[in-house]
Curated annotation (Swiss-Prot):
NDH-1 shuttles electrons from NADH, via FMN and iron-sulfur (Fe-S) centers, to quinones in the respiratory chain. The immediate electron acceptor for the enzyme in this species is believed to be ubiquinone. Couples the redox reaction to proton translocation (for every two electrons transferred, four hydrogen ions are translocated across the cytoplasmic membrane), and thus conserves the redox energy in a proton gradient. This subunit may bind ubiquinone. It is an enzyme of class 7 (translocase). The chain crosses the membrane at residues 27-47, 99-119, 134-154, 168-188, 206-226, 268-288, 294-314, 333-353. GO terms for molecular function: NADH dehydrogenase activity; oxidoreductase activity, acting on NAD(P)H, quinone or similar compound as acceptor; quinone binding. Keywords: Cell inner membrane, Cell membrane, Membrane, NAD, Quinone, Translocase, Transmembrane, Transmembrane helix, Ubiquinone. The keyword Translocase applies. PROSITE patterns: COMPLEX1_ND1_2. It comes from Nitrosospira multiformis (strain ATCC 25196 / NCIMB 11849 / C 71). It is found in: Cell inner membrane. This is NADH-quinone oxidoreductase subunit H 2. NDH-1 is composed of 14 different subunits. Subunits NuoA, H, J, K, L, M, N constitute the membrane sector of the complex. Disulfide bonds: none annotated. It catalyses: a quinone + NADH + 5 H(+)(in) = a quinol + NAD(+) + 4 H(+)(out).
Length: 366
């Protein structure tokens, strides 16, 4: 990296060299994040259909293959779906606000991509290593709901507008619980930097991870993440049995696809962030060989993959909650639990080190 920076300085001069090097570096990092993310989203849809198919005692997609190879049956399905979506027409209803109708999917997808800027894949692999990384992600994930509200209003449809209102209320309700759960992580790590949060979980084994002292907060965060991404059993914003398809009922073609790109990108983001702040990020479960020989980003991907499997497991297992049940869970269960845990955590942190040493609390409170 230093050699490349020096090369840019020699070729473009000391005035333009460093700036151009930084520009090229950031563009390459963005491409290195966005392209694998889009591929991961495509094959997450395939994995969802296959896994839920097996859970329901059926096969799932098994026809579309590469070059007619039988044992790769189904693996080309995401590519076929993408080609079909690109070729379909985007139909705009006659009574819709055309500008906002087209803009809404972009406003939903852009924050879902922007949030990935601060995700650390290993100690040195992060696009923007900022001190307020956790706060930045919370802000980006909150902005996606504006696109959903605009989509519901611009569609000029009662079904779409009702779905958008449901989604807005749901996101506001669970954003509070998620924020309070992240406050507990902030109190323990004393930092909003995601890299520092992972380093605060370093130790001999997974006993040092924040999952153990903050297990209720992990459950609150993860379930709130499922609710924020409008996934089953919290998918009342799309409730097919009640309001046809919710806020994207009038969308087709690539505009419809962009909403799902945002949804699945946010799913992967929630799983990645939970792995970083509760499951040690790139740290191995045991700090001995052969676990330490595995690259850190592999551990991060494995942890996130398990949490993504839980997303799919929920969809195949639980029926959809009623709207009032979702609101009750957020306001009367999750928010009080997180507030109590913040108070308890604050009291424990004020205990003298000698008292904390009598219990295994010094594993997490340094």
């Amino acid at each position: 990296m230093e050699y490349a920076q020096q090369l840019f300085g020699d070729f473009f001069g000391p005035e333009w060299g460093p700036a151009l090097f930084l520009l090229v570096k950031n563009v390459l990092l963005i491409v290195a994040i966005v392209l694998p993310l889009m591929l991961a989203v495509a094959y997450l849809t395939f994995a969802e259909r296959k896994i839920i198919g097996y859970m329901q005692l059926r096969v799932g997609p098994n026809r579309v293959t590469f070059f007619g190879i039988p044992w790769l049956g189904g693996w080309a399905q995401p590519i076929a779906d993408a080609v079909k979506a690109v070729m379909k027409e985007i139909i705009i209803p006659s009574g819709a606000n055309k500008v906002l109708f087209v803009l809404a999917p972009i406003l939903t997808f852009a924050p879902a991509l922007a949030a990935w800027a601060v995700i650390p894949f290993s100690p040195d692999v992060v696009l923007a290593d900022i001190n307020a990384g956790l706060l930045y992600i919370l802000a980006m994930t909150s902005m996606g709901v504006y696109g959903i509200i605009i989509a519901g209003w611009a569609s000029n449809s009662k079904y779409a507008f009702l779905g958008a209102m449901r989604s807005a209320a749901q996101v506001v309700s669970y954003e509070l619980a998620m924020g309070f759960a992240l406050v507990c992580v902030l109190m323990m790590s004393q930092s909003l930097n995601l890299g520092d949060i992972v380093k605060g979980q370093q130790g001999a084994s997974m006993l040092n991870w924040y999952l153990i002292p903050l297990f209720p907060m992990f459950l609150v965060y993860f379930i709130s993440g499922v609710a924020e991404t409008n996934r089953a059993p919290f998918d009342v914003a799309e409730g097919e049995s009640e309001i046809v398809a919710g806020f994207h009922v009038e969308y087709s073609g690539m505009a419809f696809t962009v909403f799902f790109l945002a949804e699945y990108s946010n799913m992967i983001l929630v799983a990645m962030l939970a792995s970083i702040i509760f499951l040690g990020g790139w740290l191995p479960p045991v700090n001995v060989a052969p676990f330490t020989l595995v690259p850190g980003f592999i551990w991060l991907i494995l942890k996130a993959s398990f949490l993504l499997f839980c997303f799919l497991w929920f969809r195949a297992t639980f029926p959809r909650y009623r709207y009032d049940q979702i609101m009750r869970l957020g306001w009367k269960v999750f928010i009080p639990i997180t507030l109590v845990w913040i108070v308890v955590l604050g009291l424990v942190m004020q205990l003298p080190a000698s008292i904390r040493g009598a219990f295994p609390l010094n594993l997490w409170f340094h």
